[in-house]
Protein backbone atom coordinates (compact mmCIF):
# COMPACT_ATOMS: atom_id res chain seq x y z
CA UNK A 1 0.00 0.00 0.00
CA UNK A 2 1.32 3.54 -0.66
CA UNK A 3 2.96 5.27 2.28
CA UNK A 4 1.40 8.40 3.72
CA UNK A 5 4.54 10.52 3.54
CA UNK A 6 2.80 13.81 4.18
CA UNK A 7 1.26 12.75 7.48
CA UNK A 8 4.45 11.06 8.67
CA UNK A 9 6.51 14.10 7.83
CA UNK A 10 4.11 16.58 9.36
CA UNK A 11 3.61 14.96 12.76
CA UNK A 12 6.09 17.29 14.40
CA UNK A 13 5.07 20.31 12.35
CA UNK A 14 8.61 20.52 11.04
CA UNK A 15 8.30 18.98 7.61
CA UNK A 16 5.92 21.51 6.16
CA UNK A 17 5.65 25.27 6.71
CA UNK A 18 2.24 25.36 8.41
CA UNK A 19 1.39 21.85 9.46
CA UNK A 20 0.04 19.24 7.04
CA UNK A 21 -0.22 21.46 3.95
CA UNK A 22 -0.90 19.90 0.58
CA UNK A 23 2.21 18.60 -1.14
CA UNK A 24 2.91 20.59 -4.34
CA UNK A 25 2.38 18.63 -7.54
CA UNK A 26 6.00 19.17 -8.58
CA UNK A 27 7.49 18.09 -5.25
CA UNK A 28 9.85 15.11 -5.37
CA UNK A 29 8.18 12.40 -3.28
CA UNK A 30 11.34 10.31 -2.64
CA UNK A 31 13.11 13.45 -1.43
CA UNK A 32 10.30 14.20 1.04
CA UNK A 33 10.45 10.61 2.27
CA UNK A 34 14.22 10.81 2.70
CA UNK A 35 13.86 14.02 4.72
CA UNK A 36 11.31 12.25 6.90
CA UNK A 37 13.74 9.37 7.50
CA UNK A 38 16.49 11.77 8.54
CA UNK A 39 14.17 13.65 10.90
CA UNK A 40 12.95 10.49 12.59
CA UNK A 41 16.56 9.39 13.11
CA UNK A 42 17.42 12.83 14.48
CA UNK A 43 14.65 12.56 17.07
CA UNK A 44 15.63 9.03 18.13
CA UNK A 45 17.83 8.38 21.16
CA UNK A 46 21.44 8.35 20.01
CA UNK A 47 20.46 9.17 16.44
CA UNK A 48 19.77 5.51 15.67
CA UNK A 49 16.79 3.24 14.96
CA UNK A 50 16.39 -0.29 13.74
CA UNK A 51 15.00 -0.68 10.25
CA UNK A 52 11.76 -1.99 11.73
CA UNK A 53 11.48 0.96 14.12
CA UNK A 54 12.22 3.36 11.27
CA UNK A 55 9.44 1.76 9.25
CA UNK A 56 7.00 2.34 12.12
CA UNK A 57 8.23 5.88 12.83
CA UNK A 58 7.92 7.07 9.24
CA UNK A 59 4.82 5.16 8.17
CA UNK A 60 6.69 4.11 5.04
CA UNK A 61 6.71 0.64 3.52
CA UNK A 62 9.69 -1.50 4.54
CA UNK A 63 10.93 -1.80 0.96
CA UNK A 64 10.87 1.99 0.65
CA UNK A 65 12.77 2.41 3.92
CA UNK A 66 15.40 -0.09 2.74
CA UNK A 67 15.97 1.81 -0.52
CA UNK A 68 16.10 5.21 1.18
CA UNK A 69 18.56 3.94 3.80
CA UNK A 70 20.73 2.32 1.11
CA UNK A 71 20.90 5.65 -0.72
CA UNK A 72 21.71 7.63 2.43
CA UNK A 73 24.38 5.06 3.33
CA UNK A 74 25.92 5.44 -0.14
CA UNK A 75 26.11 9.19 0.54
CA UNK A 76 27.76 8.45 3.94
CA UNK A 77 24.87 10.24 5.64
CA UNK A 78 23.93 7.13 7.62
CA UNK A 79 25.67 3.85 8.37
CA UNK A 80 24.25 0.40 8.92
CA UNK A 81 25.32 -1.66 11.92
CA UNK A 82 23.52 -4.94 11.43
CA UNK A 83 19.83 -3.99 11.28
CA UNK A 84 20.36 -0.64 13.01
CA UNK A 85 20.63 2.66 11.13
CA UNK A 86 22.89 5.35 12.64
CA UNK A 87 23.31 8.96 11.59
CA UNK A 88 26.84 9.53 10.25
CA UNK A 89 29.05 12.63 10.66
CA UNK A 90 29.11 13.37 6.91
CA UNK A 91 25.43 14.39 7.20
CA UNK A 92 26.58 17.49 9.11
CA UNK A 93 27.66 19.03 5.80
CA UNK A 94 24.03 20.04 5.26
CA UNK A 95 23.87 21.98 8.53
CA UNK A 96 27.36 23.30 7.89
CA UNK A 97 26.11 24.80 4.63
CA UNK A 98 23.48 26.78 6.53
CA UNK A 99 25.87 27.90 9.29
CA UNK A 100 28.53 28.91 6.77
CA UNK A 101 26.01 30.92 4.75
CA UNK A 102 24.77 32.57 7.95
CA UNK A 103 28.35 33.53 8.96
CA UNK A 104 27.32 34.30 12.55
CA UNK A 105 29.03 31.30 14.20
CA UNK A 106 32.30 32.08 12.44
CA UNK A 107 32.13 35.76 13.38
CA UNK A 108 30.70 35.59 16.92
CA UNK A 109 31.64 32.21 18.42
CA UNK A 110 34.96 33.53 19.73
CA UNK A 111 33.20 36.25 21.73
CA UNK A 112 30.70 33.74 23.12
CA UNK A 113 33.47 31.36 24.15
CA UNK A 114 35.42 34.17 25.83
CA UNK A 115 32.33 35.25 27.78
CA UNK A 116 31.75 31.67 28.92
CA UNK A 117 35.34 31.52 30.17
CA UNK A 118 35.03 34.89 31.90
CA UNK A 119 31.78 34.06 33.68
CA UNK A 120 32.38 30.32 34.05
CA UNK A 121 28.83 29.84 32.79
CA UNK A 122 27.36 28.38 29.62
CA UNK A 123 26.77 30.84 26.77
CA UNK A 124 24.69 30.22 23.67
CA UNK A 125 23.77 31.93 20.42
CA UNK A 126 20.33 31.31 18.92
CA UNK A 127 18.34 32.38 15.88
CA UNK A 128 14.60 32.54 15.43
CA UNK A 129 12.94 29.65 13.62
CA UNK A 130 9.31 30.63 13.01
CA UNK A 131 7.66 30.38 16.46
CA UNK A 132 10.69 28.73 18.05
CA UNK A 133 14.37 29.37 18.63
CA UNK A 134 17.25 27.25 17.34
CA UNK A 135 20.79 27.17 18.72
CA UNK A 136 23.68 27.94 16.37
CA UNK A 137 26.50 27.91 18.94
CA UNK A 138 27.03 26.50 22.43
CA UNK A 139 29.87 27.20 24.85
CA UNK A 140 29.11 24.90 27.76
CA UNK A 141 30.79 24.36 31.11
CA UNK A 142 31.64 20.87 32.32
CA UNK A 143 29.82 20.36 35.59
CA UNK A 144 27.84 17.64 37.32
CA UNK A 145 24.78 19.74 36.43
CA UNK A 146 25.37 21.27 33.01
CA UNK A 147 23.45 22.39 29.95
CA UNK A 148 22.42 19.55 27.65
CA UNK A 149 21.14 21.55 24.67
CA UNK A 150 22.95 21.01 21.40
CA UNK A 151 23.62 23.08 18.30
CA UNK A 152 20.55 22.71 16.11
CA UNK A 153 18.10 21.97 18.93
CA UNK A 154 14.71 23.65 18.48
CA UNK A 155 12.87 25.06 21.52
CA UNK A 156 9.44 26.74 21.75
CA UNK A 157 9.85 30.50 22.00
CA UNK A 158 7.64 30.85 25.08
CA UNK A 159 9.84 28.58 27.24
CA UNK A 160 13.11 30.41 26.62
CA UNK A 161 14.82 33.72 27.31
CA UNK A 162 15.55 34.47 23.61
CA UNK A 163 11.92 33.80 22.62
CA UNK A 164 10.39 37.10 23.80
CA UNK A 165 13.17 39.05 22.07
CA UNK A 166 12.36 37.42 18.74
CA UNK A 167 8.61 37.77 19.37
CA UNK A 168 9.01 41.55 19.56
CA UNK A 169 9.30 41.51 15.77
CA UNK A 170 6.48 39.07 15.06
CA UNK A 171 3.64 40.05 12.75
CA UNK A 172 -0.02 39.26 13.51
CA UNK A 173 0.37 36.23 11.22
CA UNK A 174 3.31 35.04 13.31
CA UNK A 175 1.29 35.39 16.51
CA UNK A 176 -1.61 33.54 14.91
CA UNK A 177 0.69 30.68 13.94
CA UNK A 178 2.06 30.58 17.50
CA UNK A 179 -1.45 30.43 19.01
CA UNK A 180 -2.37 27.61 16.63
CA UNK A 181 0.70 25.61 17.57
CA UNK A 182 0.04 26.14 21.28
CA UNK A 183 -3.53 24.91 20.88
CA UNK A 184 -2.49 21.86 18.84
CA UNK A 185 0.50 20.92 21.02
CA UNK A 186 -0.02 22.20 24.58
CA UNK A 187 2.61 19.84 26.07
CA UNK A 188 5.33 20.65 23.50
CA UNK A 189 5.55 17.09 22.20
CA UNK A 190 6.88 18.48 18.90
CA UNK A 191 10.06 19.62 20.66
CA UNK A 192 12.04 16.47 21.52
CA UNK A 193 14.90 18.48 23.05
CA UNK A 194 12.62 19.47 25.97
CA UNK A 195 10.83 17.53 28.67
CA UNK A 196 7.04 17.69 28.19
CA UNK A 197 5.21 20.43 30.03
CA UNK A 198 3.79 19.51 33.42
CA UNK A 199 1.61 22.61 33.57
CA UNK A 200 0.28 24.55 30.59
CA UNK A 201 0.89 28.28 30.93
CA UNK A 202 -1.48 30.94 29.67
CA UNK A 203 -0.70 32.53 26.30
CA UNK A 204 -1.05 35.96 27.85
CA UNK A 205 2.04 35.37 29.99
CA UNK A 206 4.31 35.07 26.96
CA UNK A 207 2.67 38.10 25.37
CA UNK A 208 3.51 40.09 28.51
CA UNK A 209 7.10 38.84 28.43
CA UNK A 210 7.43 39.88 24.78
CA UNK A 211 5.99 43.31 25.52
CA UNK A 212 8.40 43.71 28.41
CA UNK A 213 11.31 42.65 26.18
CA UNK A 214 10.29 45.38 23.73
CA UNK A 215 10.92 47.89 26.50
CA UNK A 216 13.87 46.42 28.38
CA UNK A 217 15.94 45.09 25.49
CA UNK A 218 16.66 41.86 27.40
CA UNK A 219 14.68 38.87 28.61
CA UNK A 220 14.83 36.32 31.39
CA UNK A 221 14.05 32.61 31.70
CA UNK A 222 13.29 31.88 35.34
CA UNK A 223 13.03 28.07 35.37
CA UNK A 224 10.59 27.93 32.45
CA UNK A 225 12.20 24.84 30.92
CA UNK A 226 12.81 22.92 34.13
CA UNK A 227 13.43 23.67 37.81
CA UNK A 228 16.85 25.13 38.49
CA UNK A 229 17.59 26.36 34.96
CA UNK A 230 17.82 30.15 34.60
CA UNK A 231 19.00 32.25 31.67
CA UNK A 232 19.27 35.86 30.57
CA UNK A 233 19.37 37.00 26.94
CA UNK A 234 20.30 40.10 24.95
CA UNK A 235 19.71 40.56 21.20
CA UNK A 236 22.58 40.99 18.75
CA UNK A 237 21.54 43.44 16.05
CA UNK A 238 22.82 44.07 12.58
CA UNK A 239 24.88 47.27 12.32
CA UNK A 240 22.84 50.43 12.53
CA UNK A 241 19.66 48.92 13.97
CA UNK A 242 19.93 49.72 17.67
CA UNK A 243 17.17 50.90 19.99
CA UNK A 244 16.96 54.29 18.37
CA UNK A 245 13.91 56.51 18.75
CA UNK A 246 12.16 56.75 15.43
CA UNK A 247 13.78 53.63 13.97
CA UNK A 248 13.79 50.86 16.56
CA UNK A 249 13.81 47.16 16.00
CA UNK A 250 12.42 46.06 12.68
CA UNK A 251 11.40 42.72 11.29
CA UNK A 252 13.20 40.97 8.49
CA UNK A 253 16.56 39.30 8.46
CA UNK A 254 18.65 42.45 8.67
CA UNK A 255 21.15 40.46 6.69
CA UNK A 256 21.98 41.07 3.05
CA UNK A 257 22.53 37.49 1.82
CA UNK A 258 25.78 36.94 0.03
CA UNK A 259 27.13 40.41 0.69
CA UNK A 260 26.87 41.21 4.38
CA UNK A 261 24.56 43.48 6.28
CA UNK A 262 21.56 45.72 6.12
CA UNK A 263 22.26 49.35 5.34
CA UNK A 264 23.64 51.36 8.24
CA UNK A 265 20.94 53.61 9.61
CA UNK A 266 23.05 55.13 12.36
CA UNK A 267 22.87 54.97 16.14
CA UNK A 268 20.48 57.56 17.51
CA UNK A 269 20.13 58.16 21.22
CA UNK A 270 16.93 58.83 23.08
CA UNK A 271 14.63 57.80 25.83
CA UNK A 272 13.92 54.49 24.12
CA UNK A 273 17.59 53.58 24.52
CA UNK A 274 17.34 54.38 28.20
CA UNK A 275 14.21 52.26 28.40
CA UNK A 276 16.04 49.48 26.59
CA UNK A 277 18.59 49.51 29.37
CA UNK A 278 15.83 49.30 31.94
CA UNK A 279 17.19 52.54 33.39
CA UNK A 280 14.38 54.32 35.23
CA UNK A 281 16.81 56.74 36.83
CA UNK A 282 18.06 57.67 33.38
CA UNK A 283 14.53 58.41 32.28
CA UNK A 284 14.09 60.71 35.27
CA UNK A 285 17.31 62.49 34.36
CA UNK A 286 15.95 63.04 30.87
CA UNK A 287 12.79 64.51 32.35
CA UNK A 288 14.87 66.72 34.63
CA UNK A 289 16.83 67.91 31.63
CA UNK A 290 13.65 68.96 29.91
CA UNK A 291 13.16 65.84 27.82
CA UNK A 292 9.60 65.27 28.97
CA UNK A 293 8.75 63.40 25.79
CA UNK A 294 11.64 60.98 26.39
CA UNK A 295 10.55 60.30 29.95
CA UNK A 296 6.99 59.75 28.79
CA UNK A 297 8.26 57.18 26.30
CA UNK A 298 9.71 55.15 29.14
CA UNK A 299 6.64 55.33 31.32
CA UNK A 300 4.28 54.61 28.44
CA UNK A 301 6.32 51.69 27.23
CA UNK A 302 6.37 50.10 30.67
CA UNK A 303 2.63 50.57 31.02
CA UNK A 304 2.02 48.83 27.71
CA UNK A 305 4.45 46.06 28.61
CA UNK A 306 2.52 45.38 31.78
CA UNK A 307 -0.62 45.05 29.69
CA UNK A 308 1.08 42.57 27.36
CA UNK A 309 0.62 44.82 24.30
CA UNK A 310 3.75 44.16 22.24
CA UNK A 311 2.97 46.50 19.37
CA UNK A 312 2.00 49.45 21.59
CA UNK A 313 4.98 48.83 23.87
CA UNK A 314 7.29 49.07 20.88
CA UNK A 315 5.63 52.26 19.72
CA UNK A 316 5.78 53.78 23.19
CA UNK A 317 9.46 52.89 23.39
CA UNK A 318 10.06 54.82 20.19
CA UNK A 319 10.02 51.98 17.69
CA UNK A 320 8.38 53.98 14.95
CA UNK A 321 8.41 52.46 11.48
CA UNK A 322 9.03 48.79 12.21
CA UNK A 323 9.69 47.95 8.57
CA UNK A 324 12.31 50.59 8.02
CA UNK A 325 15.37 49.11 9.68
CA UNK A 326 17.19 45.84 10.14
CA UNK A 327 16.50 43.12 12.66
CA UNK A 328 18.00 41.05 15.39
CA UNK A 329 20.38 38.59 13.74
CA UNK A 330 20.69 36.34 16.79
CA UNK A 331 20.34 36.36 20.57
CA UNK A 332 23.17 35.76 23.06
CA UNK A 333 22.30 34.07 26.35
CA UNK A 334 24.04 33.23 29.60
CA UNK A 335 22.63 30.07 31.19
CA UNK A 336 23.13 29.13 34.82
CA UNK A 337 21.66 27.12 37.69
CA UNK A 338 19.87 28.42 40.76
CA UNK A 339 22.63 26.91 42.90
CA UNK A 340 24.93 29.60 41.45
CA UNK A 341 22.62 32.44 40.43
CA UNK A 342 19.01 33.35 41.08
CA UNK A 343 17.05 35.04 38.32
CA UNK A 344 17.35 38.53 39.92
CA UNK A 345 21.05 37.87 40.42
CA UNK A 346 21.47 37.19 36.71
CA UNK A 347 20.20 40.67 35.95
CA UNK A 348 22.38 42.45 38.50
CA UNK A 349 25.57 40.39 38.21
CA UNK A 350 25.69 39.10 34.64
CA UNK A 351 23.56 41.39 32.47
CA UNK A 352 26.16 44.21 32.30
CA UNK A 353 28.86 41.78 31.19
CA UNK A 354 26.53 40.15 28.69
CA UNK A 355 25.67 43.57 27.28
CA UNK A 356 29.36 44.39 26.93
CA UNK A 357 30.00 41.14 25.07
CA UNK A 358 27.04 41.78 22.76
CA UNK A 359 28.34 45.29 22.04
CA UNK A 360 31.67 43.74 21.04
CA UNK A 361 29.83 41.23 18.84
CA UNK A 362 27.99 44.05 17.10
CA UNK A 363 31.31 45.83 16.54
CA UNK A 364 32.66 42.63 14.98
CA UNK A 365 29.66 42.48 12.66
CA UNK A 366 30.10 46.12 11.70
CA UNK A 367 33.75 45.61 10.72
CA UNK A 368 33.40 42.12 9.23
CA UNK A 369 34.93 41.81 5.76
CA UNK A 370 32.74 40.62 2.89
CA UNK A 371 32.27 36.88 2.65
CA UNK A 372 34.68 35.09 0.35
CA UNK A 373 32.88 32.25 -1.41
CA UNK A 374 34.77 28.99 -1.54
CA UNK A 375 34.50 26.57 -4.43
CA UNK A 376 31.00 25.12 -4.82
CA UNK A 377 30.56 21.35 -4.76
CA UNK A 378 31.55 19.82 -8.05
CA UNK A 379 30.62 16.65 -9.88
CA UNK A 380 27.68 15.75 -7.66
CA UNK A 381 25.33 14.98 -10.53
CA UNK A 382 27.98 12.78 -12.12
CA UNK A 383 28.51 10.94 -8.83
CA UNK A 384 24.80 10.31 -8.32
CA UNK A 385 24.48 9.06 -11.88
CA UNK A 386 27.40 6.67 -11.43
CA UNK A 387 25.95 5.43 -8.14
CA UNK A 388 22.64 4.75 -9.86
CA UNK A 389 24.40 2.76 -12.56
CA UNK A 390 26.24 0.70 -9.94
CA UNK A 391 23.42 0.06 -7.44
CA UNK A 392 20.40 0.09 -9.75
CA UNK A 393 16.97 0.42 -8.14
CA UNK A 394 18.46 0.28 -4.63
CA UNK A 395 19.82 3.80 -5.18
CA UNK A 396 17.16 6.55 -5.15
CA UNK A 397 18.80 9.10 -7.43
CA UNK A 398 16.16 11.79 -6.91
CA UNK A 399 16.81 11.72 -3.14
CA UNK A 400 20.57 12.03 -3.57
CA UNK A 401 20.26 14.84 -6.10
CA UNK A 402 17.73 16.68 -3.98
CA UNK A 403 19.96 16.66 -0.89
CA UNK A 404 22.99 17.84 -2.89
CA UNK A 405 21.05 21.02 -3.68
CA UNK A 406 21.45 22.04 -0.02
CA UNK A 407 25.25 21.79 -0.29
CA UNK A 408 25.30 24.41 -3.05
CA UNK A 409 24.97 27.09 -0.36
CA UNK A 410 27.77 28.26 1.92
CA UNK A 411 29.93 31.22 2.86
CA UNK A 412 29.55 33.86 0.18
CA UNK A 413 26.76 31.79 -1.34
CA UNK A 414 23.96 32.62 1.11
CA UNK A 415 21.44 33.49 -1.61
CA UNK A 416 21.49 31.72 -4.97
CA UNK A 417 19.36 31.79 -8.08
CA UNK A 418 18.02 28.65 -9.69
CA UNK A 419 20.65 28.92 -12.42
CA UNK A 420 23.46 29.24 -9.87
CA UNK A 421 22.21 26.20 -7.95
CA UNK A 422 21.95 24.13 -11.12
CA UNK A 423 25.46 25.17 -12.15
CA UNK A 424 26.95 24.42 -8.71
CA UNK A 425 25.45 20.93 -8.48
CA UNK A 426 25.59 19.91 -12.12
CA UNK A 427 21.83 19.33 -12.16
CA UNK A 428 19.49 20.44 -14.90
CA UNK A 429 17.41 23.52 -14.12
CA UNK A 430 14.30 21.36 -14.10
CA UNK A 431 15.75 18.95 -11.51
CA UNK A 432 17.07 21.78 -9.35
CA UNK A 433 13.73 23.58 -9.53
CA UNK A 434 11.75 20.53 -8.38
CA UNK A 435 14.21 19.98 -5.53
CA UNK A 436 13.80 23.61 -4.43
CA UNK A 437 10.00 23.29 -4.53
CA UNK A 438 10.32 20.22 -2.31
CA UNK A 439 12.73 21.88 0.12
CA UNK A 440 10.51 24.96 0.33
CA UNK A 441 7.55 22.73 1.21
CA UNK A 442 9.70 21.03 3.86
CA UNK A 443 10.71 24.41 5.29
CA UNK A 444 14.40 24.00 4.44
CA UNK A 445 14.74 26.83 1.90
CA UNK A 446 12.98 30.15 1.54
CA UNK A 447 12.50 32.15 -1.67
CA UNK A 448 13.13 35.88 -1.82
CA UNK A 449 11.49 38.57 -3.97
CA UNK A 450 14.68 38.87 -6.05
CA UNK A 451 14.20 35.25 -7.24
CA UNK A 452 16.95 33.88 -5.05
CA UNK A 453 16.76 31.11 -2.48
CA UNK A 454 18.35 30.82 0.97
CA UNK A 455 18.62 28.04 3.53
CA UNK A 456 16.54 28.31 6.69
CA UNK A 457 17.55 27.30 10.24
CA UNK A 458 15.39 24.19 9.79
CA UNK A 459 18.21 22.58 7.80
CA UNK A 460 19.75 21.91 11.22
CA UNK A 461 16.88 19.49 11.89
CA UNK A 462 18.57 17.01 9.54
CA UNK A 463 20.79 15.19 12.01
CA UNK A 464 22.77 18.12 13.37
CA UNK A 465 21.76 18.07 17.08
CA UNK A 466 22.82 14.49 17.91
CA UNK A 467 25.84 14.61 15.60
CA UNK A 468 27.08 17.89 17.12
CA UNK A 469 28.13 15.91 20.22
CA UNK A 470 30.04 13.25 18.25
CA UNK A 471 33.48 12.46 19.68
CA UNK A 472 36.60 11.44 17.78
CA UNK A 473 36.43 7.84 19.10
CA UNK A 474 32.84 7.62 17.84
CA UNK A 475 33.94 8.89 14.42
CA UNK A 476 36.84 6.44 14.28
CA UNK A 477 35.20 3.28 15.64
CA UNK A 478 33.35 2.08 12.50
CA UNK A 479 36.43 2.75 10.38
CA UNK A 480 38.66 0.82 12.81
CA UNK A 481 36.22 -2.09 12.70
CA UNK A 482 36.32 -2.10 8.89
CA UNK A 483 40.12 -1.87 8.89
CA UNK A 484 40.53 -4.74 11.35
CA UNK A 485 38.20 -6.84 9.24
CA UNK A 486 40.20 -6.16 6.07
CA UNK A 487 43.71 -6.83 7.43
CA UNK A 488 42.69 -9.33 10.13
CA UNK A 489 44.76 -7.52 12.73
CA UNK A 490 43.87 -5.36 15.74
CA UNK A 491 43.40 -1.63 15.11
CA UNK A 492 43.30 1.19 17.65
CA UNK A 493 43.03 4.95 18.15
CA UNK A 494 44.99 6.79 20.84
CA UNK A 495 45.75 10.30 22.07
CA UNK A 496 48.49 11.80 24.23
CA UNK A 497 47.78 12.05 27.93
CA UNK A 498 47.67 15.43 29.64
CA UNK A 499 51.26 14.96 30.83
CA UNK A 500 52.43 14.20 27.30
CA UNK A 501 54.52 11.18 28.26
CA UNK A 502 51.83 8.52 27.86
CA UNK A 503 49.29 7.50 25.27
CA UNK A 504 45.70 6.63 26.11
CA UNK A 505 43.72 4.21 23.96
CA UNK A 506 40.32 5.68 23.09
CA UNK A 507 38.94 3.17 20.56
CA UNK A 508 39.90 -0.25 19.25
CA UNK A 509 38.76 -3.12 17.05
CA UNK A 510 39.91 -6.73 17.42
CA UNK A 511 41.46 -8.57 14.51
CA UNK A 512 39.92 -11.96 15.23
CA UNK A 513 43.16 -13.97 15.39
CA UNK A 514 44.18 -16.38 18.12
CA UNK A 515 47.32 -14.32 18.69
CA UNK A 516 46.46 -10.62 18.58
CA UNK A 517 47.12 -7.42 20.51
CA UNK A 518 44.53 -7.14 23.27
CA UNK A 519 44.58 -3.63 24.72
CA UNK A 520 41.41 -2.22 26.26
CA UNK A 521 40.09 1.30 25.83
CA UNK A 522 41.53 3.51 28.57
CA UNK A 523 44.86 1.67 28.77
CA UNK A 524 47.91 3.91 29.07
CA UNK A 525 51.38 3.06 27.77
CA UNK A 526 54.68 4.99 27.56
CA UNK A 527 54.52 7.25 24.51
CA UNK A 528 58.18 6.90 23.52
CA UNK A 529 58.00 3.10 23.28
CA UNK A 530 54.90 2.83 21.06
CA UNK A 531 54.24 3.57 17.40
CA UNK A 532 51.15 5.55 18.37
CA UNK A 533 53.13 7.63 20.84
CA UNK A 534 55.95 8.40 18.42
CA UNK A 535 53.51 9.65 15.80
CA UNK A 536 51.90 11.93 18.39
CA UNK A 537 55.23 13.14 19.81
CA UNK A 538 56.59 13.83 16.32
CA UNK A 539 54.11 16.69 15.87
CA UNK A 540 55.44 18.59 18.89
CA UNK A 541 57.70 21.61 18.27
CA UNK A 542 60.66 19.97 20.03
CA UNK A 543 60.42 16.76 18.00
CA UNK A 544 63.28 17.73 15.67
CA UNK A 545 65.74 17.29 18.56
CA UNK A 546 65.18 13.52 18.42
CA UNK A 547 66.46 11.63 15.36
CA UNK A 548 63.76 8.98 15.85
CA UNK A 549 60.92 11.52 15.98
CA UNK A 550 62.43 13.56 13.15
CA UNK A 551 62.33 10.46 10.93
CA UNK A 552 58.72 9.74 11.94
CA UNK A 553 57.75 13.30 11.01
CA UNK A 554 59.48 13.02 7.63
CA UNK A 555 58.04 9.59 6.75
CA UNK A 556 54.55 10.22 8.13
CA UNK A 557 54.38 6.95 10.05
CA UNK A 558 56.07 5.08 12.89
CA UNK A 559 57.04 1.41 13.07
CA UNK A 560 57.91 -0.22 16.39
CA UNK A 561 59.17 -3.80 16.17
CA UNK A 562 59.30 -5.75 19.46
CA UNK A 563 60.45 -2.74 21.49
CA UNK A 564 57.50 -2.56 23.87
CA UNK A 565 57.03 -6.32 24.14
CA UNK A 566 58.67 -9.35 22.53
CA UNK A 567 56.72 -10.50 19.49
CA UNK A 568 54.64 -7.30 19.18
CA UNK A 569 54.95 -5.16 16.06
CA UNK A 570 52.92 -2.02 15.38
CA UNK A 571 52.69 0.65 12.70
CA UNK A 572 50.88 3.97 13.23
CA UNK A 573 49.93 7.10 11.28
CA UNK A 574 48.60 10.48 12.48
CA UNK A 575 45.04 11.82 12.44
CA UNK A 576 44.91 15.57 11.80
CA UNK A 577 42.15 18.10 12.47
CA UNK A 578 40.95 20.92 10.20
CA UNK A 579 43.93 23.06 11.18
CA UNK A 580 46.44 20.32 10.34
CA UNK A 581 47.30 19.55 13.98
CA UNK A 582 47.88 15.93 14.96
CA UNK A 583 45.13 15.20 17.48
CA UNK A 584 45.28 11.39 17.52
CA UNK A 585 46.92 8.41 15.88
CA UNK A 586 45.67 5.09 14.51
CA UNK A 587 47.67 1.87 14.44
CA UNK A 588 47.70 -1.75 13.45
CA UNK A 589 49.28 -4.15 15.95
CA UNK A 590 50.25 -7.72 15.05
CA UNK A 591 52.50 -10.61 15.97
CA UNK A 592 56.00 -10.22 14.55
CA UNK A 593 55.98 -13.80 13.22
CA UNK A 594 53.40 -12.90 10.55
CA UNK A 595 55.89 -11.43 8.10
CA UNK A 596 58.85 -9.08 7.83
CA UNK A 597 58.73 -5.38 8.58
CA UNK A 598 58.87 -4.67 4.84
CA UNK A 599 55.88 -6.93 4.22
CA UNK A 600 54.07 -5.21 7.06
CA UNK A 601 54.61 -1.79 5.51
CA UNK A 602 53.62 -3.00 2.05
CA UNK A 603 50.46 -4.81 3.18
CA UNK A 604 49.24 -2.75 6.14
CA UNK A 605 50.45 0.83 5.77
CA UNK A 606 48.32 1.75 2.71
CA UNK A 607 45.20 0.40 4.43
CA UNK A 608 46.10 2.31 7.59
CA UNK A 609 46.59 5.57 5.69
CA UNK A 610 43.26 5.10 3.92
CA UNK A 611 41.52 4.64 7.27
CA UNK A 612 43.18 7.77 8.68
CA UNK A 613 42.02 9.70 5.60
CA UNK A 614 38.42 8.59 6.20
CA UNK A 615 38.56 9.58 9.87
CA UNK A 616 40.08 12.96 9.00
CA UNK A 617 37.43 13.65 6.36
CA UNK A 618 34.61 13.08 8.85
CA UNK A 619 36.49 15.01 11.55
CA UNK A 620 36.76 18.01 9.22
CA UNK A 621 33.01 17.97 8.63
CA UNK A 622 32.07 17.41 12.27
CA UNK A 623 34.57 19.96 13.59
CA UNK A 624 33.73 22.85 11.30
CA UNK A 625 31.29 24.49 13.73
CA UNK A 626 31.36 22.08 16.68
CA UNK A 627 33.98 21.04 19.19
CA UNK A 628 34.86 17.38 18.73
CA UNK A 629 36.05 15.74 21.95
CA UNK A 630 39.13 13.58 21.41
CA UNK A 631 38.34 11.17 24.27
Where are these predicted regions, by residue range?
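N-terminal helix-turn-helix
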Residues: 2-12, 18-98, 363, 382-464, ...
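Conserved segment of winged-helix/HTH DNA-binding domains
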Residues: 90-117, 147, 458-486, 504-505, ...
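Short regulatory alpha-helical segment in sensory/regulatory domains of signaling proteins that mediates
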Residues: 112-124, 480-488, 492-495, 549, ...
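Short hydrophobic alpha-helical segments used for membrane anchoring or interfacial signaling
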Residues: 124-130, 137-139, 493-499, 506-509
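Short, solvent-exposed recognition segments
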Residues: 145-227, 506-566
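Juxtadomain coupling helices with adjacent low-complexity linkers
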Residues: 209-211, 216, 331-392, 545, ...
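A short beta-strand signature within small-molecule sensing/ligand-binding domains used
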Residues: 227-235, 243, 566-574
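Flexible loop/coil segments at beta-strand boundaries within sensory signal-transduction domains
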Residues: 237-242, 324-328, 576-582
Amino acid sequence: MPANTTNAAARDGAAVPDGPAAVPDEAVAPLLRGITVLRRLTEADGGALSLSALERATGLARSTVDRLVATLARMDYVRLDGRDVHLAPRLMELGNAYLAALRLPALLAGRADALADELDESVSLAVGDRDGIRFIHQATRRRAISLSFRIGDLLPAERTAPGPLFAVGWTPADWHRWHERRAADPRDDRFPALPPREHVSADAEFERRAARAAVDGWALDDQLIEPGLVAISVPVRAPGTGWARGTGWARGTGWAPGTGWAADTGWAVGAAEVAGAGNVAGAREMAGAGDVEGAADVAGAREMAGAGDVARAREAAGAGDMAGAGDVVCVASVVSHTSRHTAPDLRSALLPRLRAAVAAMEDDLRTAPPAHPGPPPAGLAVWTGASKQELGREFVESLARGLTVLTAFGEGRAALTLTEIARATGLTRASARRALITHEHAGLVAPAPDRTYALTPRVLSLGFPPLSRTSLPEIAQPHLTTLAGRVHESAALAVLSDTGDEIQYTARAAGGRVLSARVTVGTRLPAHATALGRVLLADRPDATASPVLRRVREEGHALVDEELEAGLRAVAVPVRDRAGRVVAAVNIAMHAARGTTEECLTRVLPELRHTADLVEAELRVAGRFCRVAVV
